[in-house]
Amino acid sequence: MTELLAPVPTPPPPHRPRRWGWLLAVLLLSVLAGVGSLAYRLLYAPNVPAAVDGPAYLYIRRGVGLTALLDSLRQPGVLARPADFAWVARWRGFGTAAHPVQPGRYTLPAGAGNLDLLRLLESGRQDTLAFTLKPFHYLPQLPRQAGRQLSLDTTQLHKLLTNNAYLTRRYGLDTATVRTLFIPGTLRLFWTTPAAAFLDSVAARHRRFWNGRRLAEADSLKMSPVQVAVLASIVQRETAQPTDKPLIAGVYLNRLRRGQPLQADPTLLWPLHGLGTRKRVLNVDKKVDSPYNTYRHKGLPPGPITTPYPQALDAVLRPAHHNFVFFCARPDGSGFSDFSETFAQHKAFARRFQHHLDSLKIRR
C-alpha cells in the first residue's frame, strides 16, 4: 500500500531591510533641516554688524520707498547680507500701502536679525538726537543750521520765521524779536521734526529757562524777557570772559538808567553784516542809518544782534553793581576790559587799545 506524505512547506525568504524607507526618512530630515537653517538665516541670524565706532544709524527721509531704502542698505558695512533683508522685506509686504516705509533716524541694533530690524522699521520707533542750537545773528542763518541736523523743510521754517502774524499769534513776538526765543544749547528732537514743531520745542525750552526766579529778576530791573535778551545779546558780543559779562551788563544798565545812549559797537556791525568778520569799528560806522545804531538812538535796539547764551542772560539779570559807565577792551588779547567812571579815564584806555590795533595793522 502506498503512503501519501504531506508536502514539506517551503521556508520564507530571509528578511531584508527596507533601504528605501530609511533613505526617504533621511532625505526628509535633510530637507527639513535645510529649510529650518534657511529660515533661521533669513529671519533670525545676525545681519547687523557690531558697531566699531559707536552706534550705527539709518536715516530714512519722507517719501522714500522700499527700492531706495534697499539701495542705502546695500552700502558697505550697513548689513552683512542685504539680499536676505530684501527678500524678507518683500515677503512681509514692507514698503506697500499696508506697511509703508516710516521716515526717521533709527539706531541699528548690533547683532539684530532681519525680522527684528523689519519690525523696528515697520513700527516707526525712531530715537531722538541731540540737536545743538548755536548762536546766530540773522534769521536766514537758522534754517541752514537746522537743515544740517534735521530733515525738516528749511523753506517752510524760513516762512514761519518771517510771518509776523504767525509769530505774534503763536509766541507773542515778531520778526525783530523772534530771535529772543532761541537760547543756545542742546534739545532732544526727532530727526523728522517738522518746522512748526521745531519752533514749538524751542519755545518750550525758552519757557523752562524763564522760571519764576528769572521772571522776578527781570521785573526788578523793570525789563521784559525780550528786553533782557536784547541787552544780553550785546553783552555776549562784547566779551567771551564770564567774569566780565556782569560788569559790562552793569555798565549798560547804568547808561539806561541815566538816559544815556548805549553806544555799543556791536550794534553798529549788525546792520552792516559785520559781526564775526569785522575786527574794528570806525567813526564812519557810527553814522550808519539803522534803528540798531545805539550811537544815534537811545535805549535798546528793536531786537537782539545775536542769540545770547544763558550765561549772558543771567549776567543781565544779575549784574555787577558799580558806577562804571565806560569800558574798553584790553590790548593784551585776554578778552578782559578796563572799566572807568569818567570819559577822561575811558579815553586813555581807548587810545591805548587803538594804538594796539594800529600796531597789528588792523584797519577793519
PLM region spans:
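Conserved catalytic or metal-liganding residues and their short signature motifs at active sites
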Residues: 2-263, 290, 308-311, 315-323, ...
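Conserved SxxK-family serine transpeptidase/carboxypeptidase catalytic domain
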Residues: 263-311
